[in-house]
Structure formats: C-alpha cells, structure tokens
C-alpha cells in the first residue's frame, strides 16, 4: 500500500517519501509522463513500471508483510502478487537512498508542462 511505501522510504532513506517525492520531477507523485529529469525521478519511473507489471492485486491499496532492520528490508509475503508490490517498493526506497546526492530542489513541484518529451518504454 502507499502507506507502507511511505513508511519503508522513511526506514530505508531516512526521509519522508510524501514530502520529498510526492511531487518531484516528471514521475514522482500521481501520474507520470515525459523523460525522468534525474536519478531520483528515474527511481519513480522504474517504480511506476514495476507497479504496471503487477497483476491480480492493487499496489496502491493492498497490504504486504515485510521486516526492516538497519535500513535492510525483507519482503516476507506468501502471496506472490503482494510480494511483488513489496519488492517494487523496496527497490524504489533503496534507489531514493542511493541517489539522495543527486536530488535537486528545482524538480520539487516541477511543472508537468516541462514533461512533454516522448516517454521511454518500461
């Protein structure tokens, strides 16, 4: 679920996903189009693609089971569909953490009018 994703980002990256990535670049937040603007925005692009491949459950609403210790996440889900959601969220949280140094404030609340280039395929 998106609520779990927020918590996971806090545990892995040490920052709020909603605050830092809720409306960032062309892909972080609702929707997504154009080209990712930087590495952090690409994390969101890849996460959107990952969610798009999930079949049989709802990535935004369905809950999964995971554990976290010292920033390491283990998806402990028996259901293959919700485990896939957990793995998508885990990869994005790690991506945010690993690319914090490329985060640029100019892409925070980036106007969608600048996201008009043709999107690349997932």
UniProtKB/Swiss-Prot annotation:
Q: Name one GO molecular function term.
A: calcium-dependent phospholipase A2 activity
Q: Which cysteines are joined by disulfide bonds?
A: 26-115, 28-44, 43-95, 49-122, 50-88, 57-81, 75-86
Q: Which GO terms describe its cellular component?
A: extracellular region
**Could you tell me which species this protein originates from?**
Craspedocephalus puniceus
Cited function: Snake venom phospholipase A2 (PLA2) that weakly inhibits ADP-induced platelet aggregation when tested on platelet rich plasma from human and rabbit blood (15-25% of inhibition at 5-10 ug of enzyme). Exhibits moderate hydrolytic activities toward L-dipalmitoyl phosphatidylcholine. PLA2 catalyzes the calcium-dependent hydrolysis of the 2-acyl groups in 3-sn-phosphoglycerides.
Q: What is its main location?
A: secreted
**Cofactor(s) needed for function:** Ca(2+)
InterPro entries found in the cross-reference section: PLipase_A2, PLipase_A2_Asp_AS, PLipase_A2_dom, PLipase_A2_dom_sf, PLipase_A2_His_AS
Q: What is this protein called?
A: Acidic phospholipase A2 Tpu-E6b
Q: Which residues bind Ca(2+)?
A: 27, 29, 31, 48
Describe, as the record does, how this protein assembles with itself and its partners: Monomer.
Q: Report the sequence similarity comment from the record.
A: Belongs to the phospholipase A2 family. Group II subfamily. D49 sub-subfamily.
Kindly give the PROSITE patterns that the UniProt entry links to this protein: PA2_ASP (PS00119), PA2_HIS (PS00118)
Q: Where is the active site?
A: 47, 89
How the cofactor is bound: the record states:
Binds 1 Ca(2+) ion.
Q: Which domain of life is it from?
A: Eukaryota
Q: Spell out the reaction equation it catalyses.
A: a 1,2-diacyl-sn-glycero-3-phosphocholine + H2O = a 1-acyl-sn-glycero-3-phosphocholine + a fatty acid + H(+)
């Amino acid at each position: 679920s998106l609520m779990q994703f927020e918590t996971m980002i806090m545990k892995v990256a040490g920052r709020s996903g909603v605050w830092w990535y809720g409306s960032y670049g062309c892909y972080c937040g609702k929707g997504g189009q154009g080209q990712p603007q930087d590495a952090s925005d690409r994390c969101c692009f890849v996460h959107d693609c990952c969610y798009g491949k999930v079949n049989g459950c709802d990535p935004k609403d369905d809950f999964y089971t995971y554990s976290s210790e010292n920033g390491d996440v283990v998806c402990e889900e028996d259901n293959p569909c919700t485990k896939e959601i957990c793995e998508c969220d885990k990869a994005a949280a790690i991506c945010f953490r690993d690319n914090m140094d490329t985060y640029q404030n100019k892409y925070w609340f980036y106007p969608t009018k600048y996201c008009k280039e043709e999107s690349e395929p997932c």
